[in-house]
């Protein structure tokens, strides 16, 4: 009688999930890779649909060789039966049982067919999602997220518009602006509310200065990549507007122009600096936040916005690991390092052995360097202190329930709301289809509340029929 091999469920097929799946399956663990997309890769390695006949998909990507290695490795493990890849499976709950875990998902674009995966351990590689701070006109057709514009280009080979302004804050704006320009869009301007020069500006504390210089010097490749983006912006004649912000979008039936203005040190528009830019598309984003819905449901402790993990990428819930953007925003290379460590640790512990950290020492060193680098990046792209003060009362902050900033302020000032949950109960902000994923950062900013995750048993909307039905059969690997 053959010995039963342990099963590891990896949720998310982006860089972290792929790295974890490959590392674990190479060490004798049966892996079930569950992902909502039709193809693996996540947002970073998003590929055009096969039917589009892309001739040079590598032109839309950095680190193409790494992607080819991951793609081919996954295909080999799937063919060998070591990995079961469940694509287009939308996970809505991970349930703890005495013998392990059950991953509940909905299959397909309709998200109505239930499926379940039983596993001995779970790796949460759920990635991150984009945040957008509300401003007047941001609900107009033609205003999209920066990540959405990039997804259209990478996955659909489609430009969101002909004349584009890219605005907001964060490193993501650089590849979005350069990618759109290279694909043929007229990118009028890249409007960055932060001052990236703070990356090299000397902090008041000498120790912070030394630490920052070391973190930057340890990543020459990242600095060279940024320089390459700047060169592309110059080549495509994209106007770069630093310490400025999109303060209002204009149009009748759809976007026609956007007003940008310079910001003072606290993030307020400087009077007399506003200018109007004609465009049919505004791609806007204000950084990323970790996806922690499933971790919250499992009871995993958070560290700031991300899932807290130890040196092995273990959470404080036994049998659960987390890797990639779910633990904090840090890019694809950091996700790969964390995923590799999580996969190796999970494989050892599910086999009942103690992991040897020396086996993943190179990945751990890379992880440490990249975490230090992105700590400096986070400092440079910190949100302006007073951005919410200029959100007008008439501005919709919760799209699903059409709640305005004025209603949120009334809940705080007149009704005594002091946290997001109370604001939600009084205004319905966050009660819609997105369950606050899109609006919570904006509502929190307008309300002056901390952005605290709301623990929910379900990570996404689920039909009542699915909840009432008998448990579905196990969709994991055969014994």
Role assignments for model-derived ranges:
Residues 2-16, 162-170:
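Beta1/beta-strand and adjacent pyrophosphate-binding region of the FAD-binding site
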Residues 4-6, 111-121, 270-280, 316:
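Core beta-strand elements of the Rossmann-like FAD/NAD(P) dinucleotide-binding domain
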Residues 6-69, 177-220:
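Beta1-alpha1 glycine-rich phosphate/pyrophosphate-binding loop at the start
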Residues 11, 34, 116-127, 278-286:
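Short hydrophobic core segments
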Residues 69, 74-105, 183-286, 290-291:
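A Rossmann-like FAD-binding core segment of flavoenzymes
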Residues 128-165, 170-176, 304-312:
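Glycine-rich dinucleotide-binding loop and its adjacent helix/turn
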Residues 145-153, 265, 269, 281-330:
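FAD-site-proximal beta/loop scaffold in flavoenzymes
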Residues 323-354, 358-362:
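A conserved FAD-binding loop/helix module that cradles the flavin
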